[in-house]
Amino acid sequence: MAAPYRQPEEAVDDSEFIDDHHDHLRDTVHHRLRANSAIMQFQKILVANRGEIPIRIFRTAHELSLQTVAIFSHEDRLSMHRQKADEAYMIGHRGQYTPVGAYLAADEIVKIALEHGVHLIHPGYGFLSENADFARKVEKAGMVFVGPTPDTIDSLGDKVSARQLAIRCNVPVVPGTEGPVERYEEVKAFTDTYGFPIIIKAAFGGGGRGMRVVRNQADLRDSFERATSEARSAFGNGTVFVERFLDKPKHIEVQLLGDNHGNVVHLFERDCSVQRRHQKVVEVAPAKDLPTDVRDRILSDAVKLAKSVNYRNAGTAEFLVDQQNRHYFIEINPRIQVEHTITEEITGIDIVAAQIQIAAGATLEQLGLTQDRISTRGFAIQCRITTEDPSKGFSPDTGKIEVYRSAGGNGVRLDGGNGFAGAIITPHYDSMLVKCTCRGSTYEIARRKVVRALVEFRIRGVKTNIPFLTSLLSHPTFVDGNCWTTFIDDTPELFALVGSQNRAQKLLAYLGDVAVNGSSIKGQMGEPKFKGEIIKPKLLDAQGKPLDVSQPCTKGWKQIIDQEGPVAFAKAVRANKGCLIMDTTWRDAHQSLLATRVRTIDLLNIAHETSHALSNAYSLECWGGATFDVAMRFLYEDPWDRLRKMRKAVPNIPFQMLLRGANGVAYSSLPDNAIYHFCKNAKKCGVDIFRVFDALNDIDQLEVGIKAVHAAEGVVEATVCYSGDMLNPKKKYNLEYYLALVDKIVALKPHVLGIKDMAGVLKPQAARLLVGSIRERYPDLPIHVHTHDSAGTGVASMIACAQAGADAVDAATDSMSGMTSQPSIGAILASLEGTEHDPGLNSAHVRALDSYWAQLRLLYSPFEANLTGPDPEVYEHEIPGGQLTNLIFQASQLGLGQQWAETKKAYEVANDLLGDIVKVTPTSKVVGDLAQFIVSNKLSAQDVVDRAAELDFPGSVLEFLEGLMGQPFGGFPEPLRSRALRNRRKLDKRPGLYLEPLDLAAIKNQIREQFGSATEYDVASYAMYPKVFEDYKKFVQKYGDLSVLPTRYFLAKPEIGEEFHVELEKGKVLILKLLAIGPLSEQTGQREVFYEVNGEVRQVSIDDKKASIDNTARPKADVGDSSQVGAPMSGVVVEIRVHDGLEVKKGDPLAVLSAMKMEMVISAPHSGKVSGLLVKEGDSVDGQDLVCKITKA
């Protein structure tokens, strides 16, 4: 029993929700409209359809003073067309009909109409619009069917009958079967006579369903079965007919109108050639560049055919025009068409109004629609915006529309259906959201309007075809107006899509996740201590006036590198009278104190001031080392993007990076070509000075990096890693060792010599001796010294280096200095100021910069290691500064936090066991991993040696012993090495000699296939960290570029009602406000998070990771696993063609999906054996749900 739609909790008629004022207003409007619509004698119209076409009809009906009635299925109860009518009634009761079946329930629809006093029924298009039995039932019930007579529908709705009619009228047709065919053998007989290609068409209905082009015998049977199945599913009749397929024809259709007195007029033609799967995608009216004589013949034939059957109401005669401009009749569609809008725009005629008034008895002459009065003006183009994913074969997308903003403006018409924020797009119906029609005085003006309108749309939450439509309308062939019916299939470059960035919604997804689940940044402990605005410092000149820092400083040591080259730079540094400073705040300082977590946005925020305050600095250490992988791994930033932005903001100070020799910035050796490629791109992107080191001081490993930097034309700072205590005669690494190493390095022609004291164990007297000895031996070689202040002697050591002849020493801004970081820049400047070693920096400016970092450190307080002071014990355990804080964190994560003192002692033991090696990344990690292994397993040094053959050592330890990190000075420890390696190989040369060169071109293609685009910088990142890079790219695909998000909101959620700003790019700012966090849904385990974005409320659904729910979702296919076959779209499985264990070949059908009245075959991506079949017939699946696996033979 049909009944008005009711809210579940209240059995109240909809009209009770409309107050008296609105009733009065509606009646007044109806009265005034009726006064201008004398032709209309009826009062109420029902539209037997859904989506946009009922809304279109309701609007005209209201203009004609008709009351309107909508019908809807249970699944459509929230659809917009229900709300646009005066009354709305559900078809049957819940579960009585399928979603599509409800709109095919002719008896039920007629019953609803009778019960509610309907006088006219408009069928729209699709569903029952071409069903003669439905038209008869309407008329038999005493109502008026807005369309042709039932007999006309019978004669023309059947394409075979229409074809026979054309032949009788001497209108040309394409060769085809004389009547409908029901058996495969009949189709086979036709192809035996006429050959291929052919087209199989459903005899009833349209929209491309039940239609297949077949080009060879192998596909014939399957295509016939699919076409008949689709036709039966969509139209209730599986009858098809067959025609010879024309290659590259145009599809031209003529809009017709006929009255009840035998009068027929045409409203000119439309070019509907741009199609996909025989469904129209873009339509143009009138056809551009159609020869006049051809147009006239087509129009004449269309009218002739309509008159021959006394055609009544609106209809469309369709023709194909081949490349010789010969036209062939296809069919007459006895209904209104989706694309009727463009005809309305060029003729000024409301076709729906004409339909209704003709049905009410009006003649064409009464409506002013005689042929001599009908003309066209300008051009109109229509696009159908759908929820389809062009990158996945236009598979329909489903889900919730999170954002919906329409286009508009001069010449833009929108006919919408369920396009609105909050709409749920289901797999049950057609995927169209809105029709966008644009008109202009010329074809080109109309085309440009459509492109502009498409760009103006903002639709989020579901994929749309807008990027494809934009590509299509911008293609030269479309611009020229020369498209044909298979143009989309024949033009693969249309799919080189530039998708919408969807930045705001992706950002909301991240912010929503932080709001629900808190920060997921690894290593973060709690929320920041400081959440206020960071005050930027002012730099004052000698007169106390603020310097203009709106632009960066452009004078510094980098200009010598750029203008004169690395050699001239090295000479200038050596000739400089003072001792220059390298500021490590932008890299090693925050690596040592804040787990390398400082983000790009916070560096850029102080960049201009830095370029002025440190304009005479030797360099800024700001890239490479751990910052490279941490940027991707934990901060979700592109390290190359960081480098580019920093370089632009600081153009005057040389940038220095840390290069791990033959490792690049990775933790193990890579093929040589990967190192050369990396250095070339790093130099191109902004690095000036490459501090090249090897973790074992292996000169062969070091040589790879040095030569790579030379090839990139960068400044080579070849580095000696300092370890131990050279003043202690019992220690392994003495002055002779270091001088011999320097000799080997100098032979490789570096521009600068670096000394890298990773643990801060270079005592002042040792510094004076080492630097002084090198200076004496190499008086023209610039020397740069790096240290950590772990023991508290860093300032003294750096001053000793300066006095012994070093040209540059390292320091960090005061508030980021000391302990495991570098010594204080303020202390060094104060100590050297006014001496012959004066660094030439303005102490007041340096202090001003520090005021910024003092605030910023509080913002990053969740990453503090909570060290309280210097640790002279470093002279014993020799743990590098950068590793010390990480080791503390790792120990706590492994449950060893209470045994920190024991861990430090174990570090000494591990170092001795490994042969007292040089300890810097990655060898320091080897020692650290072995130390934690010893503590967690409660092992002694002797236990490790004795049980080495049975212990499962950490991977890094085995890699070191194997020789993958190079050759240590003094050799590997025996018998530990042999016992631990067991049957693993032992390398006696540098690892790179055993590695095949990377196929960089193949990597680039792989990245492009996986992520849509690829740069050389992407290739370099992948070469260093394949898995980290892929995870980062996937994260960005989900959440977008988070580098623009202020750190306060990156690490913690805002307060409810707090407003904050995010600058996406110059001049584009999002104004955001967290409004509410919804309750937990027990069904989904999600919470709705509500944000206000530029004054507009948006919501995102977030998984609550703390919730415990029964997850009934199907597993998803892993796109990176070629054996896994995923559903290409959401839908219902209508047929299974395989079973577990079956051998299949590439392209064999596995299953058939039906969605949005379309069937799609899931084919085998490669040959192999089927396993793990997870679906059965009748199952509903979502896009990318795992269907089965196919294991390659």
From Swiss-Prot:
Catalyzed reactions: hydrogencarbonate + pyruvate + ATP = oxaloacetate + ADP + phosphate + H(+)
Natural source organism: Aspergillus terreus
Gene3D superfamilies linked to this entry: 2.40.50.100, Aldolase class I, ATP-grasp fold, B domain, pyruvate carboxylase f1077a mutant domain
The entry's keywords: ATP-binding, Biotin, Cytoplasm, Gluconeogenesis, Ligase, Metal-binding, Multifunctional enzyme, Nucleotide-binding, Pyruvate, Zinc
Pathway membership, UniProt: Carbohydrate biosynthesis; gluconeogenesis
SMART domains linked: Biotin_carb_C (SM00878)
UniProt-annotated location(s): Cytoplasm
PROSITE patterns: ATP_GRASP (PS50975), BC (PS50979), BIOTIN (PS00188), BIOTINYL_LIPOYL (PS50968), CPSASE_1 (PS00866), CPSASE_2 (PS00867), PYR_CT (PS50991)
Residue numbers of N6-biotinyllysine PTMs: K1157
The protein's required cofactors: biotin; Zn(2+)
Binding site for substrate: R587, D588, A589, H590, Q591, R660, T921
Domain ATP-grasp: 163-360
Keyword Signal included in the entry's annotation: no
The UniProt record lists the keyword Cytoplasm: yes
Domain Biotin carboxylation: 41-493
Binding positions for a divalent metal cation per the UniProt entry: D588, K756, H786, H788
Function: Pyruvate carboxylase catalyzes a 2-step reaction, involving the ATP-dependent carboxylation of the covalently attached biotin in the first step and the transfer of the carboxyl group to pyruvate in the second.
Residues bearing the modification N6-carboxylysine: K756
Enzyme Commission number(s) from the entry: 6.4.1.1
Binding positions for ATP per the UniProt entry: K159, E243, H278
Pfam families: Biotin_carb_C, Biotin_carb_N, Biotin_lipoyl, CPSase_L_D2, HMGL-like, PYC_OADA
A GO BP annotation: gluconeogenesis
Name of the featured protein: Pyruvate carboxylase
Domain Biotinyl-binding as annotated: residue spans: 1116-1191
Cellular component GO terms, alphabetical: cytoplasm
Catalytic site positions: R335
